[in-house]
Amino acid sequence: MLPQDTNTDPLPGDDAESASGKSADASQGTPNPGDEVAHPRRIRSFVRRAGRTSTGQQRAMDELGPTYIVPYQPEPLDWTATFGREAPSILEIGFGMGETTAHIAGLRSQDNFLGCEVHEPGVGALLKLIGERGLQNVRIMQHDAVEVAAHMLTENSLDGVHIYFPDPWHKKRHNKRRLVQPPLVKLLASRLKPGGYIHCATDWEEYAHQMVEVLSGEPALENTSKADGGFAERPDYRPVTKFEKRGLRLGHGVWDVVFRKK
């Protein structure tokens, strides 16, 4: 799930997963000192959630964490050193319990995936999947993705960004806490290479329209969809999650939004 503010209602259980990518070496540039996401109320990419780490998740943390968890440090990330190869680089913001990330990483073995998630059971769950499936192209940053993007990712270094099912903050007075807002979109657009993409998905229709509006307002981006409303077909690489299937059975919609850097 995507983190955002700590003094908030708890998140609905199943609400975030991620994926996307193309190669970049962080030595190409450095983050600008002023690259902060300016917002009257600082937006975070996550919400603090209670949750118990299972025995299997903890074992994965202990055994695989040292290899696959990348420590946060406010300096440019060297993608080649981090992954041991040059490949397209994808940032995943809020991967929840990691099933979608693991699925996409398995399908797209040619890409490198950096997943940001602060929820420890989710980190442990993805590490467990990495071990079970032998995934070599995933690394995890257990830190706020907004700070990672601002201070560790350089301009023109990403091939894609995935933001799947972020908290919709459905109460009107909480809308300002939503993740997809102009300051973050501007920051992410600066980190994308020309031709790189931002792929969002949500099951909250009003938030879906806001996503299209906010992304359309960023001059560096263009919508890949010409359909009414600006929504895209679900790309083949994004699986339908259990949470999503349940919603679809109940008649709830899901909207994909895909924009590309000009």
UniProtKB/Swiss-Prot annotation:
<keyword id="KW-0489">Methyltransferase</keyword>
<dbReference type="InterPro" id="IPR003358">
    <property type="entry name" value="tRNA_(Gua-N-7)_MeTrfase_Trmb"/>
</dbReference>
<feature type="compositionally biased region" description="Basic residues">
    <location>
        <begin position="40"/>
        <end position="51"/>
    </location>
</feature>
<keyword id="KW-0808">Transferase</keyword>
<feature type="region of interest" description="Disordered">
    <location>
        <begin position="1"/>
        <end position="58"/>
    </location>
</feature>
<feature type="active site">
    <location>
        <position position="167"/>
    </location>
</feature>
<feature type="binding site">
    <location>
        <begin position="241"/>
        <end position="244"/>
    </location>
    <ligand>
        <name>substrate</name>
    </ligand>
</feature>
<dbReference type="Pfam" id="PF02390">
    <property type="entry name" value="Methyltransf_4"/>
</dbReference>
<feature type="binding site">
    <location>
        <position position="167"/>
    </location>
    <ligand>
        <name>S-adenosyl-L-methionine</name>
    </ligand>
</feature>
<dbReference type="GO" id="GO:0008176">
    <property type="term" value="F:tRNA (guanine(46)-N7)-methyltransferase activity"/>
</dbReference>
<comment type="function">
    <text>Catalyzes the formation of N(7)-methylguanine at position 46 (m7G46) in tRNA.</text>
</comment>
<feature type="binding site">
    <location>
        <position position="117"/>
    </location>
    <ligand>
        <name>S-adenosyl-L-methionine</name>
    </ligand>
</feature>
<dbReference type="InterPro" id="IPR029063">
    <property type="entry name" value="SAM-dependent_MTases_sf"/>
</dbReference>
<dbReference type="GO" id="GO:0043527">
    <property type="term" value="C:tRNA methyltransferase complex"/>
</dbReference>
<feature type="binding site">
    <location>
        <position position="171"/>
    </location>
    <ligand>
        <name>substrate</name>
    </ligand>
</feature>
<protein>
    <recommendedName>
        <fullName>tRNA (guanine-N(7)-)-methyltransferase</fullName>
        <ecNumber>2.1.1.33</ecNumber>
    </recommendedName>
</protein>
<feature type="binding site">
    <location>
        <position position="203"/>
    </location>
    <ligand>
        <name>substrate</name>
    </ligand>
</feature>
<keyword id="KW-0819">tRNA processing</keyword>
<comment type="pathway">
    <text>tRNA modification; N(7)-methylguanine-tRNA biosynthesis.</text>
</comment>
<keyword id="KW-0949">S-adenosyl-L-methionine</keyword>
<feature type="region of interest" description="Interaction with RNA">
    <location>
        <begin position="173"/>
        <end position="178"/>
    </location>
</feature>
<dbReference type="InterPro" id="IPR055361">
    <property type="entry name" value="tRNA_methyltr_TrmB_bact"/>
</dbReference>
<feature type="binding site">
    <location>
        <position position="144"/>
    </location>
    <ligand>
        <name>S-adenosyl-L-methionine</name>
    </ligand>
</feature>
<feature type="binding site">
    <location>
        <position position="92"/>
    </location>
    <ligand>
        <name>S-adenosyl-L-methionine</name>
    </ligand>
</feature>
<comment type="similarity">
    <text>Belongs to the class I-like SAM-binding methyltransferase superfamily. TrmB family.</text>
</comment>
